[in-house]
Amino acid sequence: MSTTASQQGLTARAPALASWLDAHAETLDTDATLSGEVVPQLASAGLLRVGVPVELGGTGGTIGDAIDSVADVAAHSFAAAFVLWGQRTFIEYLLQSPNQALRDRLLPALLCGELAGATGLSNAMKYLSAIEPLQIRATDVTTLSSSGVGGGDTSSWRVNGGLPWITNLRKQGFVAAAAVDHEAGGPPSIFAIAHDAPGVHRSDDLDLIGLRGTNTAALQMTDTPLREDDRITDNAPAWLVRVRPAFLGLQCGMSLGLVRRSLDATNEGGPAARSAVADDVAALTDQLASLTTRLKSGVLRGEFVDTPASLFKLRISLAELVHDAATLEVQTGGGRGYLRGLSGVARRQREAAFVPIVTPSLVQLKNQLAAQREQQLKTGTVT
Ligand SMILES: Cc1cc2nc3c(=O)[nH]c(=O)nc-3n(C[C@H](O)[C@H](O)[C@H](O)COP(=O)(O)OP(=O)(O)OC[C@H]3O[C@@H](n4cnc5c(N)ncnc54)[C@H](O)[C@@H]3O)c2cc1C
């Protein structure tokens, strides 16, 4: 299979990873046989260190560069890009955490791909939007543990609850970020929960229609002990507002790569098909360039911390672009796209179907924007 323009970025900077992904993209989507290899492959190509300061073990650069890496991988394999999103987003949580000891403890293993990082914060994002309550509760046991043998003087808790969906729960070892409500009251916290902590149970992989090589499962905690050393933040709502642009920016990277690849694939059709869609492809290509620039500069300049609505609108526009580009690819691919093993058309249709549902989902964002607009109308502050 020849390399398309959208694939040249990764092929140039990480040729071994690019060929591995091209050889296994279908397998990564349809079964779990290679699920343990994805994080080490991404690490060998150096992608986990992109946008991480050199003094912390990274290769420097910006969050914009990390968004580009996710997009580059998505042009080859959306499943691998989703794993990269989970891992790199967890790394970002540590970079933005005030808990330096936690960062020092976990970062080296995450950057070299020995440990997988999973982000279970959909529940927290939905909580922020008043859609659902937090699903994990913490009981403060500080007094109990500090009076027991060997007890320390730092806060400690026991947590109970679960998360129905988390990606990158690599069976060889993971740490998962989860938001936790405190029985004692106060703002919820976000903790890093280790795979081998007592009471942690990872389900079997969920029986997905695609993205099956992503180690996606449910996670249950029963009386799991956690300490201050495990806490990413003690004020989840305030911290999430600051981290959300990077979280969403990296997630949007997956859409950028998918759109690029689908638009490139329209060139693989015959001359008549190409000319029929040429104007549409040109319009979508322009939109892609403009959305890419706005996304990366907005995240880099920190604009979306105070104006999340503009980021939500970008996410919605990108999801619509994914849909339009994937549809054009189907049209130009003809019957070949409907035959197994001849192209990535069917796989990209499944991948595109995931984009609107990943949190924050399109319906969630549309409702939030509508509520905000209603509020502005009431207060006469429509812009
Ligand atoms: C393959 C896969 C991997 C995933 N990986 C992760 C992961 O790594 N980490 C993680 O945290 N999550 C993950 N998720 C969860 C995902 O991000 C979404 O949260 C989940 O798919 C949507 O939740 P639900 O199906 O329970 O939606 P439901 O709660 O059933 O809601 C259906 C839809 O309506 C929206 N909705 C519900 N109530 C409201 C409301 N009041 N106002 C507006 N909109 C509303 C929801 O956002 C959703 O789009 C994954 C999901 C899948 C399919």
Regions found by a protein language model. Name each.
Residues G162-V200:
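A short core secondary-structure module
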Residues G257, A282-A289, F312, I316-H323, ...:
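Generic structural signal for well-ordered, non-transmembrane alpha-helical segments
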Residues M1-G60:
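A generic N-terminal leader/anchor concept
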Residues L34-S44, L48-N160:
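Glycine-rich flavin
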Residues R336-T383:
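Glycine-rich phosphate/cofactor-binding loops in nucleotide/flavin-utilizing enzymes
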Residues R105-P108, M125-L128, Q135-R137, L163-T167, ...:
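A generic local secondary-structure boundary/capping motif
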Residues D22-T30, P271, A289-H323, T327-R340:
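C-terminal helix-coil-helix/basic helical segment that borders enzyme active sites and/or dimer interfaces
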Residues L206-A289:
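Glycine-rich beta->alpha junctions and the first turn(s) of the following alpha-helix
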